Amino acid sequence: MKAVAVFPDSREVKLIEQDEPIITQPDQVKVRMLDIGICGTDKEICAFAYGTPPAGADYLVIGHEALGEVVEVGAAVTHLAPGDLVVPTVRRPCAHAGCRSCRAGHQDFCETGDFTERGIKGAHGYLTEFVVDDAQYMNLVPHYLREIAVLVEPLTIAEKAEHQLYGLMQRRPPWIDPAVSERRQGRGHTALVLGAGPVGLLGAMALRNAEFETFIYSRQQEPDPRIAVAKAIGATYLSSQTLPPSQLEAQIGPIDLVYEAVGHSLLALEVLRALGPNGIYVLTGVPGRQTLIEADPAALLREMVLKNQVVLGTVNAGPHDFGAAISDLEIFHRRWPGAVRALMAERTPIEQAVERILGRPAGIKSVISFQAA
């Protein structure tokens, strides 16, 4: 069967043939992969910035944003059946008995760093025709979300952040009314999203859905499909080409929440200065190797203390976040069908996957499909 693999030692990315996997344990399922989303992590792995093959292997099959169809189940699997659509989770727990998070099924909060991640660290990914995995890591997706369900995994980043926000926002007046659900926690608050890529735009949809007044700050200028999506969901778009970070507060007013989705350290620090009193700053992007920057850490820390600010780093996602992403994606598709569809580029067949991954992006979210013509 076909797969896209990275060979770190020889610095190659290529389409390979490998044996089709078989079920060996009663709690496993076999999944035919349908769509694989390509993100910045995949591109960085293909540029050999990181990525770790499984033990004993000289290559890593990439791909972690995935949608598949169950084709076979083990004897002990009762909650899934052939024909079901599933989105798999990415991270697998470490083996340390003392890691409370992994033992509780929350490996997204692993305390040891010895987790594995499909397609990223120590385990092959999903950019291959078939996968066998434990059924517990499969999230059931309704068939009517078939065309957009590959967006579930990138949406989980925002869902995890939003779930944590609900507790953090209770720490300060005006406290959230206990009668107000987590899905309405943004009412009366202003959010700024940094970046108009898939994670940023999906995060903006989640914030709009939670009733935040939402601004998106990125480098694109009109005409651009990202700006069209921002406007379609009722967010206000601001371009960094015409509005420097130093003027954000004057333009927007007090910023209650910053949702960072760019992985650019200088921009992140510049925008931190614009965070309002009692504000929360959520970091989701992972900065790559960048040139050294000048900063005044004393001033930043002083402002954080004097303004009661919180900076939160968040990575990966747990079972709750996948469930929330599936539910919210259905809501987004109902509220903004055109905007959700606009996130998806034309699907690329597996035979052209390497060229697509190594080349310029096509649309907002590149998708490799095993069913593309």
Predicted features by range, described:
Residues 1, 269-272, 318-373:
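C-terminal hydrophobic helical "lid"/dimerization subdomain
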Residues 95-190:
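NAD(P)H dinucleotide-binding glycine-rich loop of Rossmann-like/cofactor-binding domains
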Residues 22-23, 59, 79, 151-154, ...:
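Residue-level "contact hotspot" at macromolecular interaction interfaces
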Residues 157, 199, 222:
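Hydrophobic/small residue at the entry helix of a nucleotide-binding pocket
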Residues 21-36, 51-100, 142-144:
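Glycine-rich beta-strand-centered segment in the early N-terminal region that forms part
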Residues 175-179, 183-196, 208-270:
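Adenosine-nucleotide cofactor-binding segment
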Residues 265-331, 370-373:
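Glycine-rich phosphate-binding loop and adjacent beta-alpha segment
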